[in-house]
Regions:
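N-terminal pre-Walker A segment at the start of P-loop NTPase domains
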Residues: 1-14
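Structural recognition of alpha->loop->beta junctions
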Residues: 15-16, 74-80, 141-152
Length: 171
């Protein structure tokens, strides 16, 4: 039996494998580890090659530092939309990044409802981590997603259901 994937290639396929439409992913790490930088670059890649992307910059907002990151990463594409919140209607997006779940005060039930209500949309949830390096939130968050990316000191480590767990430099 064959299953259709989104056709992910390059460094992101090496990091998380070959996800299908509607996948979900958790990204976590300590402050200033490179989470947002990696996710903006991933959003850019998805917008350039795979469809419409919403990047909900709840934590940082659309201010000078976000504008600087977008310019530095050359993350300007007609399919990449930046918002300071999560719009009620997400049907026009193939991929939605929520940066961050912690700052947006989105609980696990709300995350599951987003996924359930938008089955063809992939969600990438960004979480803060504790001083010990574990992600904030209940363990159910990790069980409910298809892949997990830990960003640690500028290096992203992926693992999940798509057969590959790799690593890549962020900075």
């Amino acid at each position: 039996m064959d299953f259709e994937t989104i056709g992910l290639e390059g460094k992101y396929k090496e990091l998380i494998g070959a996800p299908s439409a509607g996948f979900s992913c958790m990204v976590y790490g300590k402050p200033k580890s490179g989470k947002s930088t990696m996710c903006i670059d991933f959003a850019k890649h998805l917008a350039e090659h795979h469809g419409n992307v919403l990047y909900a910059a709840i934590e940082e907002g659309y201010g000078y530092t976000m504008k600087e990151k977008l310019e530095r990463l050359k993350a300007t594409h007609k399919n990449l939309y930046i918002s300071e919140n999560i719009p009620h209607k997400l049907s026009k997006f193939d991929f939605v990044f929520i940066d961050s779940v912690s700052k947006g005060k989105v609980d696990n039930n709300q995350l599951n409802e987003l996924i359930k209500s938008n089955p063809k949309t992939a969600f990438i949830f960004i979480f803060h981590s504790t001083k010990e390096g574990d992600f904030r939130g209940g363990q159910e968050n990790a069980h409910d997603v298809d892949c997990i990316i830990e960003v640690k000191e500028g290096v992203a480590f992926g693992k999940g259901r798509f057969g590959i767990g790799g690593e890549m430099g962020v900075f």
